[in-house]
Amino acid sequence: MKTSDIAALEQTVEKAFENRDSVNTETRGEIREAVEAALDLLDSGGMRVAQRGEDGQWTVNQWLKKAVLLSFRLNPMQIIKGGPGDAVWWDKVSSKFDGWSSNEFEKAGFRAVPNCIVRRSAYIAPGAVLMPSFVNLGAYVGRNTMVDTWATVGSCAQIGENVHLSGGVGIGGVLEPMQAGPTIIEDNCFIGARSEVVEGCIVREGSVLGMGVFIGKSTKIVDRETGQIFYGEVPPYSVVVAGTMPGKTMANGEPGPNLYCAVIVKRVDEKTRSKTSINDLLRD
């Protein structure tokens, strides 16, 4: 699609969002066509809700998030097919695989194991593997990434290439508030089982999160070697485990309860990360 065409779509979506109270299931014409085109761009990987610049900073295409939100107003509740044993759901968002045959799957180039669920407007890159998992609308899953069993990729989340989301991992979705950025896992990261990264936090390239690490915007991420504390972002090539920090002394003079934090136990370079097993990295 030409740049001028995308700019026209953006303008239409922005205007419609400003007047969203008037958008409903009866809305036709330019607004519906623009929203559908935006969802198609997301679904095909032609555009992303956010992309990383050469300087490492992420730019969020807020108008695409607005298109996703407008689609909830445009689409009525309906039967959604594609469940195990011909089960159906009652929702406003169709399955990404609705109407797909072997031709579409072969062209897409990823593996979709039975009971994985992907909603329309999520993009799955070639080489990715989806175990029984859930990928929400507007999300992006990069090449050769594994989304393991019961992992969830939230709305508009951005998952890089060669990432492993272990069993039960939760990557939070961010549609609103509008100014908030999506949760991002950059290339070559490993997220350990049952870990959660939410609220638009970023895990930078090559990082390893051990099992059961929880990171939100208010979580202290403490570098054990330097004492530096980060919020909302794990630095590149960090090895992170769950930990605690001493709490404040209570009014009665007794030590307060320790509070949860994430601990950077070491940092490695790209060469070491590529040659060292995950278990070895996590051992102290």
From Swiss-Prot:
This is 2,3,4,5-tetrahydropyridine-2,6-dicarboxylate N-succinyltransferase. One of its GO terms (molecular function) is 2,3,4,5-tetrahydropyridine-2,6-dicarboxylate N-succinyltransferase activity. Pfam families: Hexapep_2, THDPS_N_2. Its EC number is 2.3.1.117. It comes from the Bacteria. Transmembrane segments: none annotated. The keyword Acyltransferase applies. Coiled coil: none annotated. Substrate binds at residues 111, 148. PANTHER family: 2,3,4,5-TETRAHYDROPYRIDINE-2,6-DICARBOXYLATE N-ACETYLTRANSFERASE (PTHR43300:SF10), ACETYLTRANSFERASE (PTHR43300). Keywords: Acyltransferase, Amino-acid biosynthesis, Cytoplasm, Diaminopimelate biosynthesis, Lysine biosynthesis, Repeat, Transferase. The keyword Cytoplasm applies. Homotrimer. One of its GO terms (cellular component) is cytoplasm. Its main location: cytoplasm. It comes from Chelativorans sp. (strain BNC1).
